[in-house]
Amino acid sequence: MKDKIYHQPNLEKFWFFALLCFLALGMQSCRDGDTVISSEPEDTGSKAEKGDVVGLYLLNQSNMGSNKATLDYLDLSGDNSENVIYHRNIYSERNPNEIKELGDVGNDIKIYGSKLWMVINCSNKVEVADAYTCKKVAKIDIPNCRYLAFDGGFAYISAYVAPVSMRQDAEVGAVYKVDTLTMKVVDKVTVGYQPDELAVVHGKLYVANSGGYRNPNYDRTVSVIDLKTFKEERKIDVAINLHRCRADKY
């Protein structure tokens, strides 16, 4: 790959949260029918230390088709206990009216400003919650959504668009642009087949196109999108079945 991507690190700490996305295929949700189950606090035995980082959110993927993606929280603050406390399935407890919990296949999670964004892949939606209270703020419908990136007050969400199905004629993928104030989709750009992770570098959005549904004819490109025009400028040929795309520290 001839193109080199240089990036200045973003040192801003959104509300002093540290965020971890843990994709645990075997995790189960804690709701049976419409019954709301309280979160399950567990004392880790480790002493909590006051600092900038007050906690970690963990998104559990669950098995495809089970509709049991869950959200956990590791409380590092020491506000409610001398020890670090791990809370399982807090989204169900904080949002008792959401009878289906988070949905089917938690795929990505990030904090932007005061909001927690969660990509629920096979439920074709992005759930947005308050980062402090974990109470639901909005639901954004995105078909077969995959990953998130943020820049300048907008969320950029990659989407396979096509239904989950291994077929050569699967639709080409897209990136959706969402206003983080109104929580509305404001634009969309077509990219390669089955786009996955994406990264913002110097006004450009780089998108890894996997072509995962088109085995053995995988995609092998990175789409480069100009964020001012929100148009695809070009594709960079890299390698088959790409997945991750990260900005380096330069």
Task: Write out the residue ranges for each language-model feature.
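N-terminal hydrophobic targeting signals that begin at the initiator methionine
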Residues: 1-2, 31
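Hydrophobic helical h-region of N-terminal Sec-dependent signal peptides
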Residues: 19-23
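C-terminal motif of bacterial Sec signal peptides marking the signal peptidase cleavage site
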Residues: 25-29
